[in-house]
Amino acid sequence: MRLINRLFLALLSCTLSVGVFAQTQDSTVVAAKDSVAPKKTKVFLEHANTLSFDKERNAEAQVLNGDVCFRHDSSYMYCDSAYFFEQTNSLEAFSNVRMEQGDTLFVYGNYLFYDGNTQIAYLRENVRMENGQVTLFTDSLNYERIPDIGYYFDGGLIVDSLNQLSSFYGQYSPSTKLAIFNDSVRLENEQFTLYSDTLHYNTDSKIATILGPSIIVSDSGTIYSSRGWYDTVNNTSLLLDRSQVVSGDRILTGDSIAYNRELGFGEAFGNMSLQDTAQHVMLEGQYGFYNEKSEYAFATDSARFLEFSQGDTLFLHGDTLKMTTVDSLYREVKAYY
């Protein structure tokens, strides 16, 4: 019997380049390379309780205080006070900053610099981006209205209805629902924790795409993989590039593994091996599977069984081998030709 998981995931990638934002002595940030230059439109001041000029501090700025509101196309920006640079089509906003884009995207922070020509918002201090059930937390966020991507570069957290993901660098697109994480990535779920170097995550499907060395730890065991995907809703996964599933003393290895954590069922394709480190036995084949709950294993196509508990190694070959657990000490192996 084979467990066949048929789930197709479109892997999206984003090529990054480096840009520098020097406003108020800010840090180097990473910008999306594929960003299309937006059409230049004017930023409008919609409301402020007071408007004044301070030529000594900044001759080019309109000084605004009280219930300040700006509009740029379909986006609105609110704050307690601001500097409006009409000639350069930009603004600085201070205290209780809020950006609204339609009725689905809201961004909050203590400080905002917005460039109306590039349509990039630089938010700092206690930043929060809300998009439906997805919330992003960080202290430094750059948001490009075109192509609708927000990214942090000094630590951040993204939370949805099921998972919590953190990393040093991350980005999120409200339109595609794709989040990308790099460096010290951690995905926390009620049933497991995933540690990775590089991870993509879809906040709609709740599928995490593994793109670097990763470890998934749960009460039932540990998974080691550097490429593949994990469905956090159904606890199913496809693991590639010689991944391993460890359950107690048993280690299942294969070129690719389809694994269902709820059923405790792993199906390995290509150079499959199941090692019992306590009993010093191993089952090998080009295809096989292992049921953790029944402790039943199957191997076929160049199948062989190895027993090496006594120093010398005993080999058993067959077209198909089946291994069952008799008790805590004994395994029964049957060979078929």
Where are the regions a protein language model picked out?
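Bacterial Sec-dependent N-terminal signal peptides
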Residues: 1-28
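N-terminal amphipathic/hydrophobic interface segments
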Residues: 23-337
